């Protein structure tokens, strides 16, 4: 057997074939090389998908395109394999209990088989095969595939990255590229931050002033709130059809898009369009600087809820996601303390402050619960930043923890599902190299989150018991764009830290090894190069 394989290998090399490496990023759960003679992938192979499932067909065409880009070989796609043809078979295997799990088998007899617990699982098997192909295989007539059985599944069901398009706007094509990168890293969720003080990015047919006025600011601050401005109007929004287009694009890549509409704070773009919804009546403008601002939506004004509920109707019609993110962070209560309508609401609701929270802080709990009740009628659930815990909120609310690990632990102990995204490990708008931080080049918001620190993070702390740990449903990294205005810097901040993040999301703690990860990383960097992605070359 050994001599036969050696002969096979020599013949493969003579034909210009190159071997692959299955130690990809994220690392598969189990990679077992077998004694079969392996498989020679060449242009005569056909990709066969099983059944009439549209996602399976897309998976097959994705794989064909990936192999073409990686090797130059153009493989046909079919739902029926001709007899005697070498095949890559894609199929659903109901014996795999995790919908996102897969089994990848390579051997001389069976060829290449990717089985998934669902079409989504097959998609992740396709990504592993894509990343396993050697960069050196480009232009070669064949690729040697060592025989192997890979069994794999993700650790967490929620694996996400976030993008702020309010401080700076990114086009539909740039957002699609961002989604492509998430798919490459086995992520399944895109958190789209669509509204903030600095811009409203959603076309609203019910409340058109939101995008007509709220999407534009008259100028933008230069540097870190220097008081100097560029005197250039700035704006942009997505039409409802463009939003649907992005949702479809993401769904094809097994990614769920969660829209975020900030409330009650970070709402100056709303107030610029509808000043009667503020506590003072204005005047307001779409904010040209960065920070946290006192003017928020009036909790005592019924028209605030009329607008928000109307917007949620539109959001639910565009986005099929189970979740709608309602923000809830950084909402100062100064205006509510001075607002007659808000004080009347506090009295009507019988809200009283205590030693830990003021009545105005608890009023936000009323605001959150009221919006959650409406969103539930739409068949959806809410996610909110961890500040929404500062009030009597429903246990059904999912908490997105950003201020520190302790907030996530508190939420999990209270029975909430929790997504971990702490600034110290998961803010990719922070510097990643020490020299960047020292010299402030590029100009960023600050902070320091190098690659190794991202990799070191453990989202489900050992202090939690097993039952509570089950409430940690995933991990997310955030990119805020106060100082990130163009594609190349966005991708530079994202990569390769997204690779480290993907291992937090996918790989169990006992498998993690930073040195081994760094050894595997260069192979993924070749994919970045092929795709034209900018990335930080030092780590």
How should these model regions be labeled?
Residues 67-68, 182, 250, 375, ...:
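A generic structural signal for well-ordered alpha-helical segments
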Residues 74, 188-189, 256, 381, ...:
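Residue-level detector of anion-binding/catalytic polar loops
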């Amino acid at each position: 057997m050994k001599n036969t394989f050696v002969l096979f290998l020599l013949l493969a090399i003579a034909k210009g074939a190159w071997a692959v490496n299955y130690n990809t990023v994220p690392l598969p759960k189990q990679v077992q090389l077998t004694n079969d003679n392996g498989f020679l992938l060449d242009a005569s192979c056909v990709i066969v998908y099983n059944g009439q499932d549209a996602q399976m067909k897309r998976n097959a065409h994705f794989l064909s395109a990936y192999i073409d880009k990686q090797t130059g070989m153009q493989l046909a796609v079919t739902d029926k394999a001709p007899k005697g043809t070498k095949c890559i078979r894609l199929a659903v295997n109901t014996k795999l209990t995790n919908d996102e799990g897969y089994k990848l088998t390579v051997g001389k007899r069976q060829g290449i088989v990717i089985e998934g617990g669902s079409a989504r699982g097959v998609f992740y098997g396709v990504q592993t095969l894509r990343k396993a192909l050697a960069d050196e295989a480009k232009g070669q007539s064949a690729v040697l595939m060592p025989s192997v059985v890979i069994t794999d599944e993700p650790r967490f069901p929620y694996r996400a990255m976030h993008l702020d398009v309010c401080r700076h706007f990114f086009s539909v094509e740039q957002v699609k590229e961002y989604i492509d990168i998430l798919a490459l890293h086995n992520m399944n969720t895109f958190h789209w931050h669509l509204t903030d003080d600095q811009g409203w990015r959603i076309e609203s047919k019910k409340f058109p002033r939101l995008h007509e006025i709220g999407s534009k600011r008259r100028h933008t601050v230069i540097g870190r709130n220097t008081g100097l401005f560029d005197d250039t109007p700035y704006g942009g929004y997505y039409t409802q059809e463009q939003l649907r287009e992005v949702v479809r694009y993401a769904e094809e890549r097994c990614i769920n898009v969660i829209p975020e509409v900030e409330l009650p704070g970070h709402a100056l773009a709303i107030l610029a369009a509808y000043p009667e919804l503020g506590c003072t009546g204005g005047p307001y403008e779409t904010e040209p600087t960065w920070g946290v601002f006192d003017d928020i939506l009036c909790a005592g004004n019924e028209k605030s809820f009329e607008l928000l509920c109307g917007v949620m109707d539109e959001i639910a019609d565009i986005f099929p996601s189970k979740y709608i993110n309602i923000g809830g962070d950084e909402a100062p209560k100064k205006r509510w303390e001075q607002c007659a309508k808000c004080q009347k609401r506090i009295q009507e609701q019988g809200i009283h402050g205590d030693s830990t929270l003021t009545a105005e802080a608890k009023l936000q709990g009323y605001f959150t619960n009221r919006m959650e009740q409406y969103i539930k009628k739409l068949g959806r659930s809410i996610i909110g930043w961890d500040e929404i815990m500062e009030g009597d909120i429903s246990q059904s609310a999912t908490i997105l923890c950003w201020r520190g690990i302790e907030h996530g632990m508190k939420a999990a102990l209270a029975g909430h599902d929790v997504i971990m995204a702490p600034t110290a490990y998961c803010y990719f708008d922070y510097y990643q190299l020490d020299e960047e931080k020292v010299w402030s080049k590029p100009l960023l918001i600050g902070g320091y989150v190098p690659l190794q620190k991202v990799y070191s993070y453990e989202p489900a702390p050992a202090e939690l018991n097993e039952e509570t740990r089950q409430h940690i449903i995933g991990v997310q990294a955030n990119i805020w764009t106060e100082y990130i205005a163009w594609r190349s810097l966005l991708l530079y901040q994202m990569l390769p830290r997204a690779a480290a993040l993907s291992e937090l999301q996918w790989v169990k703690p006992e498998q993690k090894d930073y040195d081994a990860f760094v050894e595997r990383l260069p192979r993924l960097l070749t994919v970045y190069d092929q795709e034209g992605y900018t990335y930080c070359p030092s780590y």
